């Protein structure tokens, strides 16, 4: 029911669409949709879209400054050498360092009037000095009186040195949506180029692999790589469960056991039973040692591989304590250096019956629990207090007289030998890991031979007939046109007679009259 206050015409508020949508505001809505933008604040980096800490800028041909942060623009210029916003060529020399003043409230402001900068402020900077001012300040104190000196440090400049940081009437270079669109366009171009390169490489690989020479070489390389067996873990890869719970994962419907790396499988203390043997060559003589691969595989593997690489060559024994031990294995000779073959410390190995109870025991030196590197020591006598603190991985089996000579070398107060004890080289006589690999290859070879013999038996029937021959004949016919009649070969045509046989003439006469 109408009220007496209702107007009989459309008011301005109703026509403008303040309280809702109607047909009369379609033109305004279209205008707003075309002119809407998201302005990037002046104190934000155009590359990272985050507030800058070390502001700088690149200037385009219209003297509009594009603001960046040094932390993000420098790596970009080193890698691409272009302006990330407009794609123009740029270098480190084109960067201009900007200097913004701050007031007591820690807000960016004009250094002369101390007026805070906002999104509606017209901000300019001097190219030669990098100082940022309000346009009103520059116009009133520099342009109109023609006083071409910086208002902060009195450095002279020209009108061309004035660059625009932010113009509230021209915010195209600070349009957030335009910057995002340019980044997405550049990303799409990279993806397109990568797809084209991938297709070209695939086409090239298919052409190259189609050649018989390359296919033969690939087959030979596969056979060499497959000499060692593939070891599987007791757990699965987990791909089936991951594909079930994640929509972004490629569907997998089969559980497969995970593959164990050869080194991880080999360094299990139950795998290798071979002992290793090596010789330590010093300037006082040679010492033969035995390596306990079955008790400390990681320590032995580390020692053997470092020795093969020449890591211990021409080093010194930096610590020598009579009736206790002699220590070496540090290339720096200080006792604070050296690293393992893996580049990081490895764990201790105490799950064995070995004890520090005899002369000639070889153990790993460390700085604490699970800090083994490259240093080792040889005992001059029993040291039970070292049990379960240092990993035992070998013992001296020859050259104890050389060990006696090393023990007699005089030392200083820091236990450093007064005369250098040089470790000239370590020679590996028996590498237990190479022996294990040979055994594994032989086992794999015997296994394949047995499988081939079983397959040969499967291809022979109980009557002794070779089923592979019939299968090959069938495979030859399994092609296009196998149901068409086979053409007669030339040999068949030559041996086929084309002369028709002579017809026998019927005999005439009286014949025999016995039936009469």
From Swiss-Prot:
Induction: Induced during the meiotic cycle. Residues 458-474 have a biased composition (Polar residues). Residues 38-115 form the U-box domain. Residues 439-450 have a biased composition (Basic and acidic residues). It is found in: Nucleus. Residues 197-222, 439-474, 492-516 are annotated as: Disordered. Pfam families: Pro_isomerase. Residues 433-461 form a coiled coil. Pathway: Protein modification; protein ubiquitination. The keyword Isomerase applies. Keywords: Coiled coil, Isomerase, Nucleus, Rotamase, Transferase, Ubl conjugation pathway. InterPro entries: Cyclophilin-like_dom_sf, Cyclophilin-type_PPIase_CS, Cyclophilin-type_PPIase_dom, Cyclophilin_A-like, PPIL2_U-box_dom, Ubox_domain, Znf_RING/FYVE/PHD. GO terms for cellular component: catalytic step 2 spliceosome; nucleus. One of its GO terms (biological process) is protein folding. It comes from the Eukaryota. Its EC number is 2.3.2.27, 5.2.1.8. Residues 274-428 form the PPIase cyclophilin-type domain. One of its GO terms (molecular function) is peptidyl-prolyl cis-trans isomerase activity. Residues 206-222 have a biased composition (Low complexity). It catalyses: [protein]-peptidylproline (omega=180) = [protein]-peptidylproline (omega=0); S-ubiquitinyl-[E2 ubiquitin-conjugating enzyme]-L-cysteine + [acceptor protein]-L-lysine = [E2 ubiquitin-conjugating enzyme]-L-cysteine + N(6)-ubiquitinyl-[acceptor protein]-L-lysine. Belongs to the cyclophilin-type PPIase family. PPIL2 subfamily. May catalyze the cis-trans isomerization of proline imidic peptide bonds in oligopeptides thereby assisting the folding of proteins. May also function as a chaperone, playing a role in intracellular transport of proteins. May also have a protein ubiquitin ligase activity acting as an E3 ubiquitin protein ligase or as a ubiquitin-ubiquitin ligase promoting elongation of ubiquitin chains on proteins. PANTHER family: PEPTIDYL-PROLYL CIS-TRANS ISOMERASE-RELATED, RING-TYPE E3 UBIQUITIN-PROTEIN LIGASE PPIL2. This is Peptidyl-prolyl cis-trans isomerase cyp8. It comes from Schizosaccharomyces pombe (strain 972 / ATCC 24843). The lineage of its organism: Eukaryota, Fungi, Dikarya, Ascomycota, Taphrinomycotina. The gene is cyp8.
């Amino acid at each position: 029911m109408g009220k007496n206050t209702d107007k009989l015409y459309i008011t301005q508020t109703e026509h403008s669409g303040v309280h809702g949508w109607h047909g009369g505001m379609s033109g305004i809505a279209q205008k707003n949709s075309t002119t809407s933008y998201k302005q990037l604040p002046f104190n934000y980096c155009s590359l990272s879209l985050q507030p800058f800490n070390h502001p700088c800028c690149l200037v385009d041909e219209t003297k509009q400054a594009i603001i960046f942060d040094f932390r993000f623009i420098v790596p970009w210029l080193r890698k691409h050498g272009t302006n990330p916003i407009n794609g123009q060529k740029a270098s480190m020399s084109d960067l201009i360092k900007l200097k913004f003043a701050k007031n007591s409230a820690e807000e960016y402001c004009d250094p002369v009037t101390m007026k805070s900068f906002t999104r509606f402020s017209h901000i300019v900077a001097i190219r030669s000095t990098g100082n940022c001012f309000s346009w009103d300040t520059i116009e009133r104190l520099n342009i109109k009186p023609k006083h071409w000196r910086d208002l902060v440090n009195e450095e002279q400049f020209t009108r061309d040195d004035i660059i625009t940081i932010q113009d509230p009437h021209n915010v195209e270079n600070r349009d957030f949506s335009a910057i995002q669109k340019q980044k997405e366009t550049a990303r799409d171009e990279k993806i397109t180029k990568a797809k084209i390169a991938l297709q070209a490489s695939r086409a090239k690989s298919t052409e190259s692999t189609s050649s018989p020479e390359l296919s033969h070489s690939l087959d030979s390389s596969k056979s060499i790589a497959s000499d060692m067996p593939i070891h599987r873990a007791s757990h699965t890869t987990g791909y089936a469960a991951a594909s079930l719970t994640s929509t972004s994962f490629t569907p997998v419907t089969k559980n497969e056991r995970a593959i164990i790396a050869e080194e991880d499988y080999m360094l299990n203390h139950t795998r290798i039973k071979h002992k290793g043997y090596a010789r330590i060559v010093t300037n006082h003589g040679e010492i033969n040692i035995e390596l306990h691969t079955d008790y400390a595989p990681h320590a032995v593997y580390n020692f053997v591989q470092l020795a093969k690489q020449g890591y211990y060559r021409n080093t010194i024994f930096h610590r020598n304590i009579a009736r206790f031990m002699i220590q070496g294995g540090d290339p720096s000779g200080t006792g604070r250096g050296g690293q393992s073959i893996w580049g990081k410390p490895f764990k201790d190995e105490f799950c064995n019956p070995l004890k520090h109870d005899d002369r000639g025991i070889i153990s790993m030196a460390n700085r604490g629990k699970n800090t083994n590197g490259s240093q080792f020591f040889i005992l001059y006598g029993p040291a039970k207090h070292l049990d379960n603190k240092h990993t035992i991985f070998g013992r001296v089996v020859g050259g104890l007289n050389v060990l006696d000579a090393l023990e007699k070398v005089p030392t200083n107060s820091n236990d450093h030998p007064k005369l250098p004890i040089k470790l000239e080289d370590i020679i590996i006589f028996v590498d237990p890991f190479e022996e294990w690999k040979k055994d594994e290859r032989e086992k794999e070879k015997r296994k394949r031979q047995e499988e081939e013999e079983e397959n040969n038996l499967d291809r022979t029937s109980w009557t002794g007939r070779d089923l592979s021959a019939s299968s090959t004949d069938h495979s030859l016919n399994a092609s296009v046109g196998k149901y068409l009649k086979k053409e007669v070969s030339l040999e068949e045509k030559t041996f086929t007679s084309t002369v028709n046989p002579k017809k026998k003439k019927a005999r005439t006469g009286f014949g025999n009259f016995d039936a009469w």
